[in-house]
Amino acid sequence: MKDICAVSTPLAEGGISVIRISGENAISIGAKVFKPLSCKSVENMAGYTCAYGKIVDKNGREVDDGVLTVFRAPKSYTGENICEISCHGGIYVTKKVLRLCIEQGAELAQRGEFTKRAFLNGKLSLTQAEGVMETISAQGEYALNSANLTKEGRLFRLISDMSRKFITILGELAAWVDYPEEDLPEISEDNLRESLKNALAGLDKIIADHDSGMILKNGVDTVIAGKPNVGKSTLMNMLLGYDRSIVTNVAGTTRDVIEESAKLGELILKLSDTAGIHETDDEVERIGVEIAKKKLKNAMLVIEVFDISRKLDEEDLELLEYVKKLGKKVIIVLNKSDLENVVERSQLEKYSDYVIEISAKLDEGREELQKATEKLLGIGGYDADSTIFANERQIACAERARKYLAMALESLDMGETLDAVTVMIDNGANALLELTGEKATEAVVDEVFSKFCVGK
């Protein structure tokens, strides 16, 4: 394989940058661009050691000073020789060091190529490689715990145990079908049925956790809706922890959609603070209302905000009916709880089981909003030591495996021939092997690693 290199840290001004080189000649390439002060040569350095020194160009002129770390094959991330050069984190100097590595024979790595080599060299399974990417992108504790479990091989072992069991069963079924005259032990249909039921239960758990996992991993598209001047922007600022939306006593201040992400417990709310939804003759405001309605149609969660100190009017009820027809998950927020409550709760409880009182101005009611949101979305109560949130590719394989294994169980219960059962189990086992990456096509592997950043 060719020698590859890339910047493994974000390309931005910072304390340090790391340039990674991997391949058979990685250490000799490192030796040409780095001159250690503490030893004679990089090529004499043992694995898992580092040295301070000078980064130099082909003429021996100093470019920067830094630290070089050596990892020797096969005890490295990729399974190949690796050199990592840590230099100062300026954009120009980082690019300069990368160019020096390319001048000495390394090629610029593709997206995810280091982790892909780890997979191809048997250092990681495909699911573990996906766990690496999920660790990088995790935005909360549940997502990070799941990513770590996947990265350490928990999902691979769970699915691999299933597939191995069915491969053994397939071998027994094939022998029994192909050599009926031989004195072979009879296949226990009860044991086979039990194996299928156990596998289906395991797959059902993975599939059932998927929707919640996607919410925790990717966040929730959330629209804050309501009439003008009910406190939508104040609520958004409260959730963000800083002033993002302009807040005034003038109705209709927000005319465009303001979008930001906020953390609410373990959830990431992708917030859209919309223009107040009401009838207006103002052309600009009217356009803002239309945009707000489009946002509502695409939202997963709608937080409808009402002023607790003002009785509900026709426009309020029209908004409630409009969102109800969209079939969205709704939390109704009665804002300004520090003022006198004149709203009849019963009018609102027809539209949502989650009606809460808050004072966004005083930052009161955040916990109640969090509890309502988690309950409405079915989030919470996960065991951090065992819950794995599979990704879309893995779920597609799990659902396909489940379909075939369920058909095998149904065939068994209906008294069909073991030939028919064998075909279904074989298809199910193949789907499980694709999930773990043991039988994934080159196109699937390429697709997985194309989602990585360059340098990982």
For each of these PLM feature ranges, what is it?
Residues 271, 305, 333:
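Generic enzyme active-site microenvironment
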Residues 240, 275-276, 300, 307, ...:
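Short glycine-/small-residue-rich Rossmann-like dinucleotide-binding loops
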Residues 1-145, 149, 153, 326, ...:
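A glycine-rich (often HGG/GG-containing) alpha/beta subdomain
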Residues 51-64, 68-72, 252-280, 298:
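Switch I (G2) and immediately adjacent beta-strands of P-loop GTPase domains
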Residues 269, 301, 331:
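Short, Asp-centered acidic motifs that coordinate Mg2+ and/or phosphate
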Residues 285-309:
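Inter-motif core of Ras-like GTPase G domains
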Residues 2-7, 11, 141-263, 280-282, ...:
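C-terminal-of-GTPase-core extension/linker across diverse P-loop GTPases
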